[in-house]
UniProtKB/Swiss-Prot annotation:
GO terms for molecular function: monooxygenase activity; ribulose-bisphosphate carboxylase activity. Coiled coil: none annotated. RuBisCO catalyzes two reactions: the carboxylation of D-ribulose 1,5-bisphosphate, the primary event in carbon dioxide fixation, as well as the oxidative fragmentation of the pentose substrate. Both reactions occur simultaneously and in competition at the same active site. Although the small subunit is not catalytic it is essential for maximal activity. Transmembrane segments: none annotated. The gene is RBCS3. SUPFAM superfamilies: RuBisCO, small subunit (SSF55239). The keyword Methyltransferase does not apply. GO terms for biological process: photorespiration; reductive pentose-phosphate cycle. It is found in: Plastid, Chloroplast. This is Ribulose bisphosphate carboxylase small subunit, chloroplastic 3.
Length: 183
């Protein structure tokens, strides 16, 4: 029986040895307990609330390159989703009192009350990513000072799967680089 208990303690000790090492409280030179997590709390930043608006998926990233957009388009088409382009003027892109359709007591941040204009029709049956990229270029050329986003729909589930910006107007002042998003 003692052997069994010994074996169990060895097993438990091996399991404890596999667990990651977390910062432990240690005594500093003044005799007070200190913890590395306290230092991390001091390094926390405050989110910059001004001119720091986001749009859907990938908004926290810098603007996507053409190559990155192409990879996203390939992923959309590989899943048999339908891509669609939408655009909106700078002053109409965000939810607000001026650009929302009110149908009763609805909050101004309710997303379904704000519509972007569709660029042509959804690209039903599209299998070539270059077609989508050429439509993005055509829309950007036609509306250079508008926000343009690519959304995709799943016909089976009948829902929007994803949406992300593919063009931000050069005059937009609402975007901050990731390093400038906190103070």
């Amino acid at each position: 029986m003692a052997t069994t208990m010994l074996n169990r303690s060895v097993i438990v000790n091996k399991e404890v040895a596999k667990t990651p090492n977390f910062p432990r409280a240690t005594k500093n030179n003044k005799g007070f307990a200190s913890n590395a997590a306290v230092q991390k709390c001091r390094d926390m930043m405050v989110w910059q609330p001004f001119n720091n608006k986001m749009f859907e998926t990938f908004s926290y990233l810098p603007p996507l390159t053409d190559e990155q957009i192409s990879k996203q388009v390939d992923y959309i088409l590989a899943n048999s989703w339908t891509p669609c382009l939408e655009f909106a003027a700078s002053d109409q892109a965000y939810a607000g009192n001026e650009n929302c359709i009110r149908m009763g007591p609805v909050s101004s941040t309710y997303q379904d009350n704000r519509y972007w204009t569709m660029w042509k029709l959804p690209m039903f049956g599209c299998t070539d990513g270059s077609q989508v990229l050429s439509e993005i270029q055509a829309c950007t050329k036609a509306f250079p000072d508008a926000y343009i986003r690519l959304v995709c729909f799943d016909a089976n589930r009948q829902v929007q799967i994803s949406g992300f910006l593919v063009h931000r107007p050069p005059s937009a002042t609402d975007y901050r680089l990731p390093a400038d998003r906190q103070v």
